[in-house]
């Protein structure tokens, strides 16, 4: 059986092709899953997300955690920022060549919704400042919400992406997402309490 590559660190570098990212902004927090992780997000001209663990963990677990953080940051920015590179390091079990091959695999396997459509790139630099909002508690709530949203969130991201879908398809997706989103909002807040799903014919 092929050995799963493991390491202790993932660093992702983002650069905006059209403007310098403002800063300095920085936030750090720790989360406990099966293993403990420390996350740092720094921004000044570029953005850097660093995820570290005290022990070797699967590179796929590191990348999955990174992807969830990236999607959370997208809510604050209003669009995805271009990912320039992923760096995997600090492994006690595999050499750098294997880690480099994993880096290439992750970069080539990026889904198309990580490239936001032009209409998402507003002239303002961001919608919300991540450094004043993100905490370990907020991230844990985000993980739970992602599980609850499931395919709804992915459809939303594809509707805002530069994926080649026509505008009418994107609009149809967004309209279809209204009902499940309202149900989730009703479940967690007092908003839209009077709305009920209509009969489908």
Predicted regions and their residues:
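Amphipathic alpha-helical interface elements
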Residues: 145-201
């Amino acid at each position: 059986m092929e050995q799963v590559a493991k390491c202790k660190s993932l660093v992702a570098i983002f650069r905006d092709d059209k403007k310098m990212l403002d800063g300095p902004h920085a936030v750090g927090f720790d989360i406990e899953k099966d293993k403990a992780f420390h996350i740092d997000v720094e921004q000044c001209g570029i953005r850097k997300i660093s995820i570290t663990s005290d022990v070797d963990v699967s590179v796929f677990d590191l990348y999955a955690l990174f992807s969830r953080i990236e999607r959370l940051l997208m809510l604050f920015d209003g669009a995805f920022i271009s990912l320039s590179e992923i760096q995997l390091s600090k492994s006690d079990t595999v050499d750098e060549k294997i880690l480099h091959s994993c880096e290439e695999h992750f970069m080539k396997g990026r889904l198309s919704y990580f490239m936001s459509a032009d209409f998402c790139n507003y002239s303002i630099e961001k919608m919300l400042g991540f450094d004043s909002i993100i905490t370990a508690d907020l991230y844990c709530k985000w993980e739970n919400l992602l599980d609850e949203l499931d395919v709804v969130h992915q459809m939303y991201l594809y509707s805002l992406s530069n994926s080649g879908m026509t505008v009418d398809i994107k609009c149809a997706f967004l309209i279809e997402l209204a009902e499940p989103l309202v149900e989730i909002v009703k479940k967690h807040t007092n908003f839209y309490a009077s709305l009920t799903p209509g009969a489908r014919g």
